[in-house]
Amino acid sequence: MQADPLFTDEIAIDLETNESRIVQKEIYLENVSEWTPENPVLYGIQPMDDLIERFGFREIKVSGKYILLNGRPIRIKGFNRHEDHPMFGCAMPLQAIEQDIQIAMDLGANAIRTSHYPNDELFLDLCDEQGILVWEESHARGLKEYHMQNPYFQKQSEDCIREMVMNHKNHPCIFVWGILNECASETLYGRDCYTKQYRQLEELDRTRPRTSASNKHKNDICLDIPEIVSFNLYPEWYSDQNETAVDCIQDMMQWIRNNPVTRNKPFIVSEIGAGALYGYHTRTKDKWSEEYQCIALEHQLRAVLESAECCGVFIWQLTDVRISRERFENRPRTMNNKGIVDEYRRPKMSYEIVKDIFTSYDDYFETNL
């Protein structure tokens, strides 16, 4: 059923042959319904040429260590997701994208990070419809300082950011913009790049906070710039096996709260996880077994979600994905095998562990702000 329109208007436009024009108009609407994960209300714009652009009304704000969605402190329970499929590669059709979102929702997730590039408009449309929050980020990841010194790097980054924001800013699901995953944020040259790109984001869109997933941890010198602090942490996988997930997470949270630059900012664990080969089982719960992934993920997720000092987590990752053949070391099958489901979307043992943990925590923090 189609509801009565909130607002109608006509704008007369005269165009010459082969001429194109951009038309902008600001309007003020009253008595609108908020877009929330529980009730993702969408409104549409329908020009006479049949282009339909949908949007939603919601407010994203940072207040101290919390991210507020319509005034309520949201707890992020999310996944990192690559656009990759064994049948379709990165050109995934609507049905395959829908399947990924349904898997994430069944697991109890309320957010997805587009690691590490802007995503298909179909994906964002579906997240708008289903009430899934999205961290969308530009296409730059794992770069050393010498990579960032390439004379084409900054312009390409700026072009990507501009296209991402201008094309996708009307999607209410996007709650944060990200840049430069695991890049040279510990160097002065890197800081200059981060500063320029954060400034560009602010100029393009002041309604959303900014962040960057860092693996430089206590050596990062760019944490004063964005509104949200995000770290990629892999306790009980890459790190010293004697360091527990609880020790790692608590140490990082304590450092963040003791650091004058970060103590009053929200903190997100932007990546965490462990690998498992689908169908590989061992009684001794060795690395790469489905049993070990269950143990590591349970330790990691409970360490993060039990703390009110962290406003959320993105598991690395939703599905197993292909990687470069040159990076075969520590990558069986030349795949990143940290998915909760494999590349064919078959669930591993950890599926039920993650689902049980995610669904046991509310989507919002109980706090008086």
Task: Label the predicted regions.
Residues G131-S138, I228-Y234:
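Short hydrophobic/aromatic-enriched beta-strand-loop microsegments
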Residues Y117, H139, L180-A184, R206, ...:
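Catalytic metal-binding/acid-base residues of hydrolase active sites
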